Amino acid sequence: MLIWSKKVHLICTEKKLLFSGIKLFNMEATNIYSIASSYLQWLAPGRAKQRFKRFLWKLAPGKMSEIMPNNTKQEFAIGMYRGDLPFELDDVGFNPVLTHADVNDVPAAFVADPFMIQADGTWHMFFEVVNRATEKGEIGLATSSDGKCWKYQRIVLTEPYHLSYPYVFEWQNEYYMIPEGGRAGGGVKLYCATSFPERWKCIGNILSGGRFADSSVFRYEGYWYLFTDASQIAESPLLRLYWAKDLLGPWNEHPASPIIEGDPHIARPGGRVLVVDDKIIRFTQDVFPVYGSKVRAFEIDELSLTTYNERQVGREAVLGAGKVEWNSGGMHHIDAHMLDDGKWIACVDGWFSRV
């Protein structure tokens, strides 16, 4: 059941649509969808239709999936991009480099959320593998000597709940990982490699209670910072920022947090946070009008324990739907690394619709 008691004033100049004073009380979601669909059918594609969809999202973000159902089945795969800057990258031309078909130890539905790290001359990529048998995400591993050709190794981390977004990093000669734990409500857990890259142990909970998605940690001027989507509603992300002196905490919420509230275009983290030449770049996934639409970049101009300011890099997204099948639906993740020659390499993911 859904209760709407707001007056709505929406003028779409394209069709001169005036949708004013509508009240919907105790209506089934299917009935609301029928009303919304009747307007969307005669609104021409373009800005007017997008405005109407955004209005519906703002009015009831928690019910958006019921009002505007999306029957798209997304199949994700992993690719590699290269370029001169971390937010100016191009398809290397032989993508995807990893798909569900490469996974040989579990029946995989798709692969996504890649993070990589170089150790002893070898690239190690960790990523989400959705296991068809358990219908949960597990963390897989692939390796490469050149960042081009990748060989799947095995599943390296499983839990009784869904895992994804395996944010891997190195600190003081130790390898750590912060995977997302889905909607299990177990907080943000920190893992340490006991035998890198295949064996991992949870060493602590750095944030507890509630749902935390796509947690992204980085170190800046002697402190650890962590972005996370703390919304209880996946369709309406809430970007919170925390800081700590020590990796295991205690973690404190930043005075400027929440950084972004309720904006599906720029709130949810979309990959590794970069700190290069005293510049901080955060990537965000655009989850509107569908999950996995685009990736945008923001440069953080000011960050201290009490202040925060950022600006978007460019006017357009840095990643989006491609012209070939593997990422024709959209893209939602990036992990960029600088090479010895100053160029950049990134593992990314994209998706296409399947029946």
What positions do the PLM features span?
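Polybasic, lysine-rich low-complexity intrinsically disordered segments
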Residues: K7, K15-K16
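Carbohydrate-active catalytic/glycan-binding domains of CAZyme proteins
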Residues: F25-V355
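Position-driven detector of the extreme protein N-terminus
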Residues: L2-W4, E28
